[in-house]
């Protein structure tokens, strides 16, 4: 329950700062996790990216401000963080379907998006297999791409990198270098601590590879969930981990990378494991 309470405290912080700057790192601190893990949890639990939720809340309040008085559009835009009237107009129309200049007209309808409240709902769903393992640090080698701090901006970047290395032969080269546990092609999101965020496509290997990068995955305790199926099934498993397992598990996110292990990378029926770093709650 503490985990859910912290998420709701983070929502309270967002509400207090809708007319100011919202610090994603502070959200992570309130929720006792990295800003990356907070954004992932929020997206799965709320059904929308964090940035979209914030935009909807701001535009909901902006409509109230414009309807209820003589506030100038430029002042309301500035209040909610838009330095450009054009950007504000675009955001307002995307939510309400009308221009902000027409909001005071008789009979005009706007949308209201109230604040989210998280709670635990127990329902009868399928079982989840997992194991808890504590592992020493291990070396991976491969290629990486930088990630944005707003994770939805990376949705096209990561698949593009997988496609690139599949075509240019790098993926097959990595598979041949693989000689240590965990055995499989790894997708590693290093979005923890103060380091720059990166996504690695790599293998656990003792070998050196010309033109390849290396990263040391820190020692950590991992909750490991096996699965099989398409890429969509991986996303569904990750959603269930965050929304069903984590809130009642007695664990919370640790400050370490997220890992996907592709044991058999058949795009139609892959065998994989999802590793999330955990510590005992409290």
What residues fall within each predicted segment?
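Alpha-helical structural signal in soluble globular domains
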Residues: 41, 45-46, 53, 95-96, ...
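Terminal helix-turn-helix DNA-binding modules in bacterial transcription factors
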Residues: 4, 8-25, 44-80, 107-126
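Conserved hydrophobic/aromatic pocket- or pore-lining residues that grip, position, or stack substrates
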Residues: 14, 38, 241
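A solvent-exposed interaction/effector surface
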Residues: 64-67, 74, 78, 83-282
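Short, Lys/Arg-enriched, disordered terminal segments
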Residues: 1-4, 280-282
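Append "Primarily bacterial transcriptional regulators
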Residues: 25-34, 38, 42, 76-83, ...
